[in-house]
Amino acid sequence: LQTDYQVRGAVLADDMGLGKTFQLLALMAYLIEREPSIEPMLVVAPVSLLENWVDESRKFFHENSLPLLTAYGDALASLRVPKNQIDQRLQADDNLVRFLRPNWVGDAKVVLTTYETLRDFEFSFAGQKWSLMVCDEAQRIKNPAAMVTRAAKKQNVAFKIACTGTPVE
């Protein structure tokens, strides 16, 4: 994703319920249509909003125009590297054995996940090249010392969008 002005990010902020999710999904669908080989896009949102992202994509877009992968819950469990396949020296610390399988994104062009999942699997997410990252309810990453903020900053992403329906300080 390149811009004429070499901007690396944007903020999309307005009141709740005015269509930010739809606007971002439309942008993603446009980017995929324009460049089918584009790197996947990452959407990080609170757990309470993940289903909204899925519902909006199903409601307004054909399944093939926005191939989605939800990296949360049961779907996330199927993407994990089994603990017994990780070096025994790392197995002693549960925080060090949270990895996702190689090529875990598959054919998905949009990956939906939570802030907690991004934090817990930061190395696997950071190992993936992303064309776009959307942080929904971006106030979750305003504390620079927080682990979730650090995980978000480690992502290998070309363009970032902070999205919020909460007044920005």
Question: What is each residue range found by the language model?
Answer:
Residues L1-E169:
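ASCE P-loop NTPase motor core, strongest for the SF2 helicase catalytic module
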